[in-house]
Amino acid sequence: HQSILFFNGCWGALKAYRALSKRQDIPPLTIGETANMPFIAALSQDGSEILIKGIKEEIAYSAAGDDKAVSAFLHRLAPRVVKTASFASTSLSATNPVIHVTASLFNVTRIENKEDFYFFGDPMTDRVISFMEHCDEERLAVGKALGIRLSPLLEVLNSFWPEKKNTLKEALKENPSYRAVKGPSSTEYRYF
């Protein structure tokens, strides 16, 4: 039995499931995805190493098929692993689309000018945070319309780390794991 696991799925598992479930020539397969990455990491300057900057305490995932191997693997990565009901639930629970896209759009001139900046530092202004909160309200409304109970962005971020924060701004600016994250250097970067 084989498994395919999409980290920070964002609908990747659903696309793979739709494509592969129609095929008759593949062995039994489990397809899963996580709502978010289990760690914060960056590639070294020379591309030879992955630098782990922080490991999250909780990972949410969904899977189609026998998920025992997927669950066991994720339990090796994080102390808390939560299975959600569907790919829609994990994809809509992803924090990166709300955080990364919003902050990148608000800082697009820095990115186009190839400025070297820390993504979760000065760019997280009150206006950026307010816009993220509005985007999060929309995300929660979409989930509700689909019958999916989603957790607010701050609650999700607080589930990742031992130190809980009272505001989204605190959660993004004061987390030591986020401090070393550099901003994108191109509008071709994955945050877009």
What are these regions (language model features)?
Residues K15, A19, F73, E138-A141:
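Alpha-helical scaffold segments in soluble metabolic enzymes
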Residues F106-F120, K169-F192:
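A hydrophobic C-terminal alpha-helical subdomain
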Residues I4-N8, P123-F131, R190-F192:
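Conserved aromatic-histidine-acidic binding/catalytic patches
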Residues T125-V128, H134-P176, E188:
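Small-residue-rich helix-loop
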Residues P38-F131, C135:
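Substrate/ligand-engaging "lid" and interaction regions
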Residues H1-S44:
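Rossmann-like NAD(P)(H) cofactor-binding subdomain of soluble oxidoreductases
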